């Protein structure tokens, strides 16, 4: 993908970034290098490689899924300014 100096300036403008001519040239060189690396990676034939979710085929040991805290709903609602049917009542902010 070819990138021009005008493209860099336009993206900087869209991002609301003030960029000088010298900074735009430096950014163009850096972005062109990044796009070059991406093009190299896209050129690699990976059709014969099986997709994997992790580098090592191991199972992760997980802890038992259980409640670790006690229910404090009543305590929290006792200090709330307004509660009705277990719900917190708040002032209407949007008409």
Swiss-Prot record:
This is Aspartyl/glutamyl-tRNA(Asn/Gln) amidotransferase subunit C. Allows the formation of correctly charged Asn-tRNA(Asn) or Gln-tRNA(Gln) through the transamidation of misacylated Asp-tRNA(Asn) or Glu-tRNA(Gln) in organisms which lack either or both of asparaginyl-tRNA or glutaminyl-tRNA synthetases. The reaction takes place in the presence of glutamine and ATP through an activated phospho-Asp-tRNA(Asn) or phospho-Glu-tRNA(Gln). One of its GO terms (molecular function) is asparaginyl-tRNA synthase (glutamine-hydrolyzing) activity. InterPro entries: Asp/Glu-ADT_sf_sub_c, GatC. It catalyses: L-glutamyl-tRNA(Gln) + L-glutamine + ATP + H2O = L-glutaminyl-tRNA(Gln) + L-glutamate + ADP + phosphate + H(+); L-aspartyl-tRNA(Asn) + L-glutamine + ATP + H2O = L-asparaginyl-tRNA(Asn) + L-glutamate + ADP + phosphate + 2 H(+). One of its GO terms (biological process) is glutaminyl-tRNAGln biosynthesis via transamidation. Keywords: ATP-binding, Ligase, Nucleotide-binding, Protein biosynthesis. Belongs to the GatC family. Heterotrimer of A, B and C subunits. Its EC number is 6.3.5.-. NCBIfam families: gatC.
């Amino acid at each position: 993908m070819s990138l021009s100096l005008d493209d860099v300036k336009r993206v900087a403008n869209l991002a609301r970034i003030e960029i000088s001519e010298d900074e735009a040239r430096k950014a163009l060189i850096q972005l062109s290098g990044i796009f070059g690396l991406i093009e190299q990676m896209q050129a690699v034939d990976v059709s014969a490689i099986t997709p994997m979710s992790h580098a090592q085929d191991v199972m992760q040991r997980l802890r038992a899924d259980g409640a670790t805290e006690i229910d404090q709903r009543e305590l929290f609602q006792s200090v709330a300014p307004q509660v009705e049917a277990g719900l917190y009542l708040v002032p209407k902010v949007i008409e």
